[in-house]
A protein has these predicted regions:
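Conserved short alpha-helical segments that host acidic/polar catalytic motifs at enzyme active sites
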Residues: 7-191
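Extreme N-terminal basic, low-complexity initiation segments
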Residues: 2-5
């Protein structure tokens, strides 16, 4: 076959049955993130479970869910498939809330150890935060070094924890979490 070099490669591929799709256009499984916000307190953990189950093809190394019930976080993460990590009894123990975020992991950075399961929960001077991330930072190494030199202690080998600490640093300087996230995005590179 011949290599198709076109920004509209799916269309070109369909037109040329002997075309070879460039490797950078192949599908890659790189984690899955699913979240729910509800105006009222609800069983958001079950909703998140089904969302993660649907995304499980994107990551089968670990799964995690964090439920926020008016600022009280209940979290559970472990290695394994969604249905193994969250049998009915464990899902019920997460309780109800109005915000939930979940993550299925496929290691692209860091190892596939349990400690790298997400979402990550961070306690800081102005509150708590749960973060789940799907992607890779291109300046993770530099940011991690900068953060460690300023006193941050890392518990994982993921670049997701780098993002969390950058957001926390910005949160200490800004009046809202939204502004902190906005400022943090200016410091990180990648996806």
């Amino acid at each position: 076959g011949r290599v198709v070099k076109d920004d509209t490669w799916p269309i070109c591929y369909a037109k040329h049955s002997n075309a070879v799709v460039p490797k950078e256009h192949h599908l890659h499984e790189e984690c899955g993130v699913f979240g729910v916000f509800s105006e009222a307190c609800a069983d958001v953990a079950s909703l998140d479970y089904y969302g993660l189950f649907a995304l499980q093809h994107r990551g089968q190394e670990s799964a995690g869910i964090v439920v926020n019930d008016d600022g009280v976080f209940t979290a559970y993460c472990d290695e394994g498939l969604v249905n193994d990590v969250f049998p009915k009894e464990r899902l019920q123990k997460l309780g109800t809330g109005n915000i939930v975020v979940g993550h299925v992991r496929y290691a692209t950075t860091g190892s596939d150890r349990k400690r790298n399961a997400q979402p990550i929960v961070i306690n800081h001077h102005k509150g708590r935060m749960a973060l789940a991330h799907n992607g890779n930072l291109t300046n993770s190494y530099e940011l991690r070094n900068e953060l460690e030199q300023s006193g941050s202690i890392f518990h994982t080998t993921t670049d997701s924890e780098v993002i969390a600490y950058i957001i926390v640093q910005e949160r200490l300087r800004t009046p809202s979490i939204e502004e902190a996230v906005y400022e943090a995005m200016g410091r990180i590179e990648g996806a």
